[in-house]
Amino acid sequence: MWAEKLLARYLEGVPFQIVLEHSRLVANTALDVCERLEMPLNNRVFIEEAALLHDIGVSRVNAPELGLHGDQPYITHGVLGRAILESEGYPLHALVCERHIGVGLTLADILKQNLPLPHRDMYPVSLAEEIICFADLFYSKKPDKLTHKKSVERVRKNLFAFGDEKLRVFEGWVVRFGV
């Protein structure tokens, strides 16, 4: 698929294998949601492509545990991915990159946490963005946990630290998308 080839232009070796495996797991979970929602084929194709590319921005971050030695903080991988995919001519896929962090980031989140990100809302808006964001919550890129799917309860516990609103968003997705 073209999305995997594009990913391979930005990552190589072990980092490529980690991100590809993670992205395939996210894509498969997202496609399961699409099946439950009986989404049309063209929507499913976009969701699969965007899920495969959602972490392309890690190619520019510093995450030695993943074999990544870029010069940017990990939290910026969403906006970096957006820039990459916009430059490649994929503006809708690019938005998925920017909006997939946690359950999404609001301007208030960015300011309150003093995150090194542009000052704007970065939360999923479209159904496709929400589905990919939801699916991504179940998987880690940590090599020793790469193929382990987190339980709904584990995701809840992870999100709890970020506040009730983040948990409410996730709970809404659980009801809407199933698991």
Annotate each predicted stretch with a short phrase.
Residues Q17-H22:
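A short, charge-rich alpha-helical start-of-domain segment used by transcription regulators
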Residues R24, P91, V175-G178:
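Generic structural signal for well-ordered, non-transmembrane alpha-helical segments
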Residues L11, M39-V152:
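Divalent metal-dependent catalytic cores for phosphoryl transfer on phosphate-bearing substrates
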Residues K157-V179:
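Charged phosphate-binding loop/patch that engages nucleotide di/tri-phosphates or the phosphate backbone
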Residues M1-F16:
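Generic N-terminal amphipathic, Lys/Arg-enriched alpha-helix
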